[in-house]
Amino acid sequence: MFVGQYVEERSMKMRIAIGCLLASFAITAAAVAANPQAKLEPKPTFASVLDHQLSSTEKTVVPAAEAMPEDKYNFAPTQGEFKGVRTFAAEVKHMAVANFHLGAAILGEKVPVDTGNGPDGPAALTSKADILKFLNDSFVYAHKALNSINETNILEPVKSPFGPNMTTRLALAMSITGHPYDHYGQMVEYLRMNGIVPPASRK
């Protein structure tokens, strides 16, 4: 579904992703060795490291979605090179759609909600409240998916949700934590064009 909307992770990107996870474990292990009290802390797992990263992403993008007034949710620039770009609402719904599809692929199950017939989510979702619920629910589901990842299944082949190829849970997890930032940048532009400072940029 949505073939062409996403690109499969390449081997170099995979090596970088694995390297980042291993580096995180190494840093934590070094901290524990240097501080005996740290041994009382829970040992990090693949799931906990990935889930922490998703929480960081969520804490950045959700407040941005909340910051736009309802009467501006359908805002999109219409002139010059901006013509045809997604509205603010479509950006938010698109993030949620991706979260649901990536999460379902990690869990090996069908997407649990109606995500519409395209990458921008259900057309029936038009109010700010409904769109925010869709986004928040998608993050709840994404957290569930990441917490199912362990050292046994993290590199097992799984079907990509965006084409016929196979991928891994690690590749999907890196997408689910990083993909929202692709659209957060656009949301920031829309907020600032309407005189709103993004929450993450406020002092």
Each predicted region: which residue ranges?
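Acidic/histidine-rich, surface-exposed loop or edge segments in extracytoplasmic proteins
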Residues: 37-46, 109-124
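Bacterial N-terminal signal peptides
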Residues: 19-29
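Short, contiguous alpha-helical
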Residues: 51, 55-62, 74-119, 159-203
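Boundary at the C-terminal end of the N-terminal hydrophobic targeting segment
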Residues: 29-36
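Well-ordered alpha-helical scaffold segments within catalytic/enzyme domains
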Residues: 60, 64-65, 103, 141, ...
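Short, Lys/Arg-enriched N-terminal segments with co-localized hydrophobic residues
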Residues: 1-13
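Surface-exposed helix-capping loop/turn segments at secondary-structure junctions
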Residues: 66-75, 146-155, 192-198
